[in-house]
Curated annotation (Swiss-Prot):
Function, in words: Nucleotidase that shows phosphatase activity on nucleoside 5'-monophosphates.
Family matches, as SUPFAM superfamilies: SurE-like
HAMAP family per the UniProt record, alphabetical: SurE
Keyword Nuclease carried by entry: no
Name of this protein: 5'-nucleotidase SurE
Location (main, coarse): cytoplasm
Compartmental location: Cytoplasm
Organism annotation: Bradyrhizobium sp. (strain BTAi1 / ATCC BAA-1182)
Length: 255
């Protein structure tokens, strides 16, 4: 089985080594194509106005000066040649990708691009606490990642579905189990704009997260609730975003 791995944290991110280790537990035909620089939050952006620069950093390890989407396209359509990958793994992201994160996440986008190419694709993310932000533990991802991917692959992944896996911020022996979840939703206002001043007194801004606003009680059955209860969250996400429930009503409204 040929596996293509990517991420959005960049070619030198610790989580990329973790995704490679997970991949090597499944196959010895593993290829790494990841962004040259950190691309967190770029979502499914595609580089159309700038050339892509490709650098081989080691055997079957390549850095692309572009987005995670660019990396998957470069890997599948150029680097791997005539033999497409059988599986795309994106991650392991430093930080969870749940609720509204899936819209912004480059990790999710890397897996989605694999799905667009008709390949079974997984996004894997490791939650961390404030105390472990600088050095999150990857042991939980290493323990549960291979078995989740293997079991889902054996059962088969629908063509337009990407599997979003999030590991809780705890040691492997503290994980209560695996649970299939739906995408959650945070309180409004979890994003904030932080205004600061530079040395000349000019304003500049950071987009950040208001942790206090996000500390609501998550709905049962969601990815947020699973992580809060120390479960590994496995969420199937569809590429087709059509609102089928509203489609019929919209047809009536528009006559």
């Amino acid at each position: 089985m040929r596996i293509l791995c990517t991420n959005d944290d960049g070619i030198h991110a610790p989580g990329l080594k973790v995704i490679e280790e997970i991949a090597r537990a499944l196959s010895d035909d593993v290829w790494i194509v990841a962004p040259e620089l950190d691309q967190s939050g770029v979502s499914h952006s595609l580089s159309l106005n700038d050339p892509l620069r490709l650098r081989e950093v080691g055997p079957r390890h390549f850095a692309v000066r572009g987005t995670p989407t660019d990396c998957v396209i470069m890997g599948a359509r150029h680097i791997l040649g005539a033999k497409l990958p059988d599986l795309v793994l994106s991650g392991v992201n430093k930080g969870r990708n749940v609720a509204e994160d899936v819209v912004y996440s480059g990790t999710i986008a890397g897996a989605l691009e694999g799905t667009i190419l008709g390949l079974p694709s997984f996004a894997l993310s490791q939650e961390f606490s404030i105390a472990t932000r600088d050095k999150p533990s990857w042991d939980t991802a290493l323990k549960f990642g291979p078995q989740i991917v293997r079991k889902v692959l054996e059962a088969g992944v629908p063509r337009n579905t990407v599997i979003n896996v999030n590991f809780p911020a705890c040691a492997p022996d503290e994980v209560k189990g695996l649970v299939v979840t739906r995408q959650g939703k945070r309180n409004l206002g979890f994003l904030k704009v932080d205004e600061r001043r530079d040395g000349r007194g000019n304003p500049y801004f950071w987009i950040g997260f208001d942790r206090a606003a996000a500390l609501d009680v998550p709905d049962e059955g969601t990815d947020l609730a699973a992580l809060a209860a120390r479960y590994v969250s496995v969420t199937p996400l569809r590429l087709d975003r059509t609102d089928e429930a509203f489609s019929g009503k919209l047809t009536t409204i528009l006559g």
